[in-house]
């Protein structure tokens, strides 16, 4: 297994206007991340990949393309989580057979699952695949909150390496790192990277890293070195960019920023707005000129 720490892009997926996967565009996004952004790895099949609007076959195809293009150049994490446990297991087996370095799974959502059911979900995926696992915690979208003691219960399974922590609860983050120092934490909010790194995270997984990895790496390294004023200056610029992206449409705008760099990033998947308006294109061009 490769080193899983550092800067990981949450991989965007290029779609054609009819919603089908644009394989050429997806390969270009992967190459851009590896060759230009110099990421340490890719997190494939997450929220940024518009994953929860895709069929099982489409998810498998994205895993296949990403592994075929990246090969062993960087670390690859496959997000296989689903409210359908059978699908999660099927995807986990497939990604493991392809040679992904680790699996990740979002907490099961929509229904109010008990913690015992959530633990069973993770233990089952691990038992069926034999691969390592990263818990994907994103409570503002799933409504699932896992406490410090509950993480301890999950961590009794030695295959669970840590958590992708996409939350703003830095008290919980600090408590987790203190309680379980041997388990890894990846920051999931790009706009709050500096405080997360100051609290000891081992890496970061972010959507804006598809276009902004150099600054993300600066924040990560400067904060680790204790150069907080310098790191904060970079975080300010990063957040100015992120603010513009969020106001203009997150995934759509990042795709337009990639297109401005010659990457065939395609469209978004409906029911998201698939194609940028003229106004959104103007904003993307202004963001590109100012920040990239």
UniProtKB/Swiss-Prot annotation:
The active site is at 136 (proton donor), 164 (schiff-base intermediate with substrate). Pathway: Amino-sugar metabolism; N-acetylneuraminate degradation; D-fructose 6-phosphate from N-acetylneuraminate: step 1/5. Pfam families: DHDPS. GO terms for molecular function: N-acetylneuraminate lyase activity. Aceneuramate binds at residues 47-48, 166, 188, 190-191, 207. Keywords: Carbohydrate metabolism, Cytoplasm, Lyase, Schiff base. It catalyses: aceneuramate = aldehydo-N-acetyl-D-mannosamine + pyruvate. Catalyzes the reversible aldol cleavage of N-acetylneuraminic acid (sialic acid; Neu5Ac) to form pyruvate and N-acetylmannosamine (ManNAc) via a Schiff base intermediate. Homotetramer. This is N-acetylneuraminate lyase. It comes from Actinobacillus pleuropneumoniae serotype 3 (strain JL03).
């Amino acid at each position: 297994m490769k080193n899983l720490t550092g800067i990981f892009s949450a991989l965007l997926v290029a779609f054609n206007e009819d919603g089908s996967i644009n394989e050429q565009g997806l390969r270009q996004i992967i190459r851009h991340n590896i060759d230009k952004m110099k990421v340490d790895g890719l997190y494939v099949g997450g929220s940024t990949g518009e994953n929860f609007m895709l069929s099982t076959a489409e998810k498998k195809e994205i895993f296949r393309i990403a592994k075929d293009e990246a090969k062993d150049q960087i670390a690859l994490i496959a997000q296989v989580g689903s409210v359908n446990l059978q699908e999660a297991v099927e995807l986990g087996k497939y990604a493991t057979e392809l040679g992904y370095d680790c699996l990740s799974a979002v907490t099961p959502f929509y229904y109010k699952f008990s913690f015992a059911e959530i633990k069973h979900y993770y233990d089952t995926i691990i038992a069926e695949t034999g691969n390592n696992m990263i818990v994907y915690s994103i409570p503002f979208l799933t409504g699932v909150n896992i406490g410090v003691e509950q993480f301890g219960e999950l961590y009794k399974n030695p295959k669970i390496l840590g958590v992708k922590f996409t939350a703003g609860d830095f008290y919980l983050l600090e408590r987790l790192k203190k309680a379980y120092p041997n388990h890894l934490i990846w920051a999931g909010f790009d706009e709050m990277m500096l405080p997360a790194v100051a609290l000891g995270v081992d890496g970061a997984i972010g959507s804006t890293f598809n276009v902004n990895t150099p600054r993300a790496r600066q924040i990560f390294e400067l904060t680790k070195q204790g150069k907080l004023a310098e790191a904060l200056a970079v975080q300010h610029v990063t957040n100015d960019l992120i603010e513009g992206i969020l106001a203009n449409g997150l995934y759509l705008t990042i795709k337009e920023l990639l297109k401005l760099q010659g990457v065939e990033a395609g469209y978004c998947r409906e029911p998201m707005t698939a194609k940028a308006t003229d106004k959104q294109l103007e904003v993307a061009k202004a963001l590109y000129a100012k920040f990239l």
